[in-house]
Regions:
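N-terminal glycine/serine-rich phosphate-binding loop of ATP-dependent small-molecule kinases
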Residues: 1-52, 62-63, 79, 107
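Residue-level signal for well-ordered alpha-helical scaffold segments within enzymatic catalytic domains
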Residues: 16, 20-23, 67, 96-100, ...
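Glycine-rich phosphate-binding segment of PLP-dependent enzymes
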Residues: 44, 65-75, 126-127
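Carbohydrate-associated surface elements
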Residues: 58
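Gly/Ser/Thr-rich active-site cleft segment
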Residues: 77-142
């Protein structure tokens, strides 16, 4: 069973919280979003979410490490990213998407990690916060 994230409901609660702040006169001057680092959203060219966003605790990544290692060895992957192997890392989640729904990757224009997606919903700006991006085993620090 997939662990589906309910972004519409979660974002509605963020907006409700901001409205409550306004009602009581406590207007935040800044806001940060923090979630588990490896989960992501794929957006198409019109910024629509492709498929369901599935949380890292799902079992769909089982065996995806072996699929990734057909393209790059674990040793080389670690040398490039400096991130330890965890079966739930973004790289293995993306391989699971490639195997089950390759059309999502074909249509995707943007990958945003979950905190960056919430920032996008709040601001309309697509950004990729560096330390967040490194957690997924996709970024080379060099």
């Amino acid at each position: 069973m997939f662990t589906i994230m309910e972004f519409d409901r979660l974002f509605k609660e963020v907006v409700n919280g901001l409205k409550k702040c306004k009602e009581i006169g406590k207007i935040p001057v800044s806001m940060g979003v923090d979630t588990w680092g490896v989960d992501f959203v794929l957006l198409d060219k019109n910024d629509n979410v492709l498929g369901n966003t599935v949380g890292y605790r799902d079992h769909r990544t089982e065996g995806m490490d072996k699929e990734v290692y057909k393209a790059i060895s674990l040793k080389d992957l670690y040398a490039r990213t400096g991130i330890q192997k965890a079966d739930y890392n973004t790289i293995y989640q993306l391989m699971a998407v490639k195997k089950k729904h390759p059309e999502y990757l074909e249509q995707a224009e943007t990958l945003l990690h979950v905190p960056d997606y919430f920032h996008f919903l709040l601001t309309g700006q697509k950004t990729c916060e560096y330390t967040e991006a490194t957690t997924g085993q996709l970024v080379s620090p060099i």
